[in-house]
Amino acid sequence: ASVVLAVLSTPVEHPKIPEWEMILSSGAVCMNLLSCAQSLGYASQWLTEWYAYNDKMLEYLGARKNLDKISGFIYIGHKIEEPTERRRPVPEKIISYL
């Protein structure tokens, strides 16, 4: 990847925004970065991997231990080749309605 972005969830105390919404918003950031990169013709991927949970990595990124979390690493670059399509589940077998 030509670029790797680290996305952190850094919740703060706020009278109107619950911590859970702050955490969810960092996931939305990751998803929007993927969408934007792909719309511009780049290949992109969102991974966490072991280093997202590593204290040294958190320290390196300036995160607050036990407060901030790495939501993921966004890899952006150019495709060398088209990825092969993986088998997908049949929606009717995994979705149920009430």
Language model: regions and residue ranges:
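Glycine/small-residue-rich phosphate/adenosyl-binding loop
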Residues: 1-26
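Short coil/turn connectors at secondary-structure junctions
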Residues: 1-3, 42, 66-70
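Acidic, glycine-rich active-site loops and adjacent beta-strand->loop/helix elements
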Residues: 11-12, 50-54, 80
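GST superfamily/GST-like fold recognition
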Residues: 17, 21, 42-56
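A short mixed-secondary-structure module that forms the rim of ligand-binding clefts
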Residues: 27-33
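Short hydrophobic alpha-helices that are characteristic scaffold elements of the AMP-binding
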Residues: 35-39
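Short low-complexity, flexible loop/linker segments enriched in glycine and/or proline
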Residues: 60-63
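C-terminal helix-cap and adjacent tail motif
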Residues: 66, 70-98
